[in-house]
Amino acid sequence: MTRIPAADPAAGPAAPLTFRLSVLSAMTDPTSDGPVHVPVLAQEVLRSLGGERGDNSLDGLVVDVTLGAGGHSALLLERFPRLRLLGVDQDPEILSIARERLEPFHDRVRIEHARMSELDSLLGALDEAPIGLLMDLGASSLQLDRPERGFSFTWDGPLDMRMDPRRTRTAADIVNRWDESDLADLFFHEGGERGARRVARAIVDSRRRAPFRRTRALSELIALSLGRPIRSRRTESAPRGSIHPATRVFQALRRAVNEEADELEAGLTAARNHLAPDGRLLAISFHSGEDGVVKRFLAEGAREGEWDLETRRPLEAGPEEVRSNPRARSAKLRVARRLRTPGGGV
């Protein structure tokens, strides 16, 4: 059994960091001079996990199951000096950034490379139940904005989209091998693309001549099949209400490559199985399908007496945060408190 060492209450936080939201994104886009990664709904996360105490007395283990670059976790560790953290992520490249960012808190942090589908066994090996579990779903800006990762429809790169390199199937495999009806279903159900059948038909026609290998070639074909011009600037710079024509198809491909629906279900189940009584689950989603899965899971658990829903409606970013971080516009945070263990105990 494994335990993360308890923090020394007399010592306070290990090397407190001075960064807050304004300077939290030290990483920059390789094709831009601007900052990219700012954790969304950060203040809402701090308040939700800290409860109504309004102080820094939170004590115990929190698991960040989508650690990313460590933005949320760094703020939690700084805000709550007695808190300990288990940070988990499936992307080893992003984990290297998190390790550096969280180094000042090294004695309070353990970092693991794992998927949410591996959480049940990982948490089962701990000798303490977490008091909090945080999910920040979807792709990180540090993944989306690195062309070589293959997530971007604005920058050219290999058509990959794997968050975990242990996976063998890439976006190119799906685009080049799935039949037309399966592609159309994927684009519609996982991406919400209304022109899914037109896009799928265009892909199948085009790949007969040459397989897709690069993101730009696919992005341009999608735009052409939908009859929409491609902008040269980023989505965030587009007119209000406008998105890049390839957005929904790329989202659907990313979700399929990384099996995000199955991973989310596994992560929610692990939270139910291992959170301590009165522990809180915090789930941030950017996709209506993901939010629906979380909502239904918690609603069913609430009917069974497993969860107290602390947010009947999801928390959303305010106008100021959206102005400073446009990606926060679609973020939704749901919070629930664990009432009892699956076996019926309290």
Stretches with model-predicted labels:
Residues 2-8, 12, 16-346:
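S-adenosyl-L-methionine-dependent methyltransferase catalytic core, i.e., the SAM/SAH-binding region
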